[in-house]
Amino acid sequence: MQTEFIKLAVIFIVIMVMVLAKLKLRDAMIAAILLTVILFGIPIGDAAKLMIQSVYEKDTLLVVGSFILVTFLQRIMENRKLLERAEMALQRLSGDRRMVCVIAPVIIGFLPSAGAVNICGAIVDKATGKDLDVEEKTFVTSYYRHISESFSPTYNAILLALSITAVSTGQFVLFMAPMVVVLLVLGYVFYLRKLSKGYEAGEDETIDKKEEFKQLLYCFWPLVLCIVLVIALNLSVIKVLPFIIVLSIIVYRLSLKEVLDFAKTSVEWRIIFNTIILMMFKNILTYTGAIGKLPDLFAGSAIPQFAAFGIIMFLGTIISGANSMIVLLIPLAFASIPHAGAGLLVYLMALSYVAMQISPTHICLAIITEYFRVSWGQLMKKTIPVIVVFVVILTGYYVLLSGFGI
C-alpha cells in the first residue's frame, strides 16, 4: 500500500511542479497519464482502450455538450448586452458591486454546467473593473460560482452522497448551511472587501427598484428557468438547455445569421480537448484501483478516525475527483465511525468540495483559467489560503456537531 501511495504522490507532485512552472494544465495532465501508465504498469493496450473510451463515454459527452450549449446561451446574452444590464440592475438594487460578485455567481452556480463559469466571469470582470487583478478576478469567479455546488441537490455529487447514506436532503442542507455562510464570508474577507461599494445614485436620480427587478428578470430569465426546470423536473442540464435556447432565440429575436455565428463560436476546441484529457486521466487513475486502497494507509495510526477519513477524502478528491471518492469512501466512513450521521456527511462532503477547488482534474478550473488567461498555479496561490482557514473552521464545526450526537 505504501508503494502505491508513493506512486500517487509522485504523480501529484509532477502535476503541481508543471503547473507551478506555468506550463499548460493540458501538458501536465498528459505527463500525468504517461506517468500513471508507467508507474502502475498498465498494459499499453488497456491504456489505449481507456483513452479512446474517454472520448465518447457518456460523462465526457455530457460535459462537452453542456459546455457548448451554455456557451451558445452566453453568446446570446453577450450579444444582447444582458450580462451588462443584469450587472447594473444588481448594482442599483443592492447599491454594492461586491454583492454583484457574490449573488450572480452563486445563483448561476445552481446550474450544474462547467460552461456557466464563463458567464460568471463576464459579470465579475465587468463589476470589478481594474480594482481587482486578473488572479483575484479568477478566484472570485470560480470560488463564488462553486459555492452552490457544496450543498445544492442539483449536483450529482450531492445526490450520490445522499443516496448511499441515511441522511435526508433537508438534514444535509440544514447542517451544511453554516459552512456555506463561512465560505461566503471568507471570500469577502480575503478579496472582496478591498472593493469599494461602487454604484451610488446621484442626488437627482431615483431608482425604481420594481423596474430594476424587471430588468434583472428580463436578463436572467433563461438561467432562472433552466435552474427551476432542472430542480423541479429532476432533469439534466443538457436536456433543458435546447428548450431554453429556442425560447431565447424567439424572445430576443435572433436572426438566422446570428444563430449560425453563435453556433460556430460556441465550439471552443481548446477547452473541449482539455476536457477530454482530464477525463482520460480520471479513468486511467480509477483503473489502477489505488484510490480505493488509501484507507489501509491510516489503519492503526494515532490520527482520529474522522480526521483520517477526512485526509483521504481531501487528497483522493484532488487526485481523482469527487464522485469516485464519494462512492469509495463514504460507505467505509459510515461503517467505521460509530453513530455516523449528518455531521460526518457534511464534514466529508465539505472537504470534497474544497478539494475540488484545487484539483487539476476539475474541468471548471481549466475553463476559467483559460477565460482569464491565467495559469492554474496563479489561481491556486489565491485559493489555498482561503481553503486552509475553511478546513480549520470545518473541523471545529464537525467536533461540535459530533459532541451533540449529530
Indicate residue ranges for each PLM-predicted region:
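Hydrophobic transmembrane alpha-helices of multi-pass solute/ion transporters
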Residues: 1-69, 85-89, 223-302
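Short helix-coil transition sites and intra-membrane helix breaks within transmembrane domains
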Residues: 25, 62, 74-81, 109-120, ...
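Small-residue-rich segments of transmembrane alpha-helices in multi-pass membrane proteins
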Residues: 33-46, 98-103, 205-223, 268-283, ...
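C-terminal transmembrane helix pair
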Residues: 138, 143-146, 157, 172-185, ...
